[in-house]
Amino acid sequence: MPLTTDTKKVMFEIYRDADYGGRYRVVYFTELGEHDKETEIENAMRGEHIFDGFLLHRERNQAKQVVDEILDRLNRGENVDENAIRESLQRYLA
């Protein structure tokens, strides 16, 4: 049975980069191309895990905006814990 838009998911991880001054970053694993897949996965694996999950495919653009806002807050030094991230993304999580 083919996947419908409602069952597709985007796997992602928010992490603190081990390089580049410890900035918080996100990687959307299921959207990586072959040319950047290995590098992006290695960067995430070296970093400090903050949050991961699956976003609903149909809501991915709105969810990415929320993720960007979370990253901005983290990179400004705000304390945003896992529960706050989950709450912010709740309506977009699969």
Locations of regions flagged by a protein language model:
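Mixed-charge, Lys/Arg-enriched low-complexity segments
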Residues: 44-94
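Short N-terminal "domain-start" leader segments
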Residues: 1-46
